Regions:
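Structural motif
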Residues: 13, 55, 114-116
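Condensing-enzyme catalytic core mediating Claisen C-C bond formation in acyl metabolism
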Residues: 1-30, 34, 39, 133, ...
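Acyl-thioester C-C bond-transforming condensing/cleaving domain
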Residues: 2-4, 46-48, 64, 75, ...
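Glycine-/small-residue-rich active-site loops that bind phosphorylated ligands and cofactors
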Residues: 21, 61, 93
Length: 191
């Protein structure tokens, strides 16, 4: 295995697009992907024809309500004929998509990349049941884990092992609310 380049080429975010974070019964998933993509491209001053790499960050298929949603939504964004890759890392899919785009650009696989993501978890019939299928099938599935219980167990472990306190978690929440309050499209816009 080769070592990473100690001085990789610089990569910059040159455009951003986002739709409001709320229930959108007035728009299809394709509409949301198209709107955010067009806004990001316009903000960057580039066209989809300038894009070499498309990174699709989508939730597990069970939450999207269909198999391989990226294959259906990317054409609506004008991404036909572009090299694409799907990324899914649970609650960190957005940053994982951006990071994947950065690494591919630094690796010389293209000059312009776009990370596109969409979440419509309301389309799943039973969100906890879907999440329960992503845990270890032998040891964890019968426990009935959810994202909340999984995070609570991890937080408890961090408190026992490294001395985190409830105040630390409150600081994280307060910081996140403060950041969200600066984004008028966020789900929670007040600190």
């Amino acid at each position: 295995m080769s070592r990473p380049d100690p001085d990789p080429p610089e990569v910059a975010v040159i455009g951003v697009g986002q739709t409001p974070y709320r229930r959108r019964h007035d728009a299809t998933t394709q509409d949301l992907v198209r709107a955010a993509t067009q806004e990001a491209l316009a903000d960057a001053g580039v066209a989809m024809s300038d894009v070499d790499i498309v990174i699709a960050g989508f939730a597990p298929d069970g939450l999207a309500g269909e198999n391989c949603p990226d294959k259906r939504f990317l054409p609506g964004a004008g991404a036909v004929g572009r090299w694409s890759m799907r990324v899914n890392t649970g609650g960190t899919t957005g940053i994982a998509a951006a990071y994947t785009a950065m690494v591919l650009l630094q690796g010389g696989y293209g000059d312009v990349a776009i990370a596109i993501g969409v979440e419509r978890m309301a389309q799943a019939l039973d969100v906890p049941a879907v999440f329960n299928t992503i845990f270890d099938p032998i040891y964890e599935r019968d426990i009935g884990l959810s994202t909340i219980s999984m995070c609570a167990m991890r937080a408890s472990r961090m408190m026992m092992r490294w001395g985190y306190t409830p105040e630390h978690w409150a600081q994280v929440g307060a910081r996140n609310f403060a950041h969200a309050s600066r984004n008028p499209l966020a789900q929670i816009t007040r600190p």
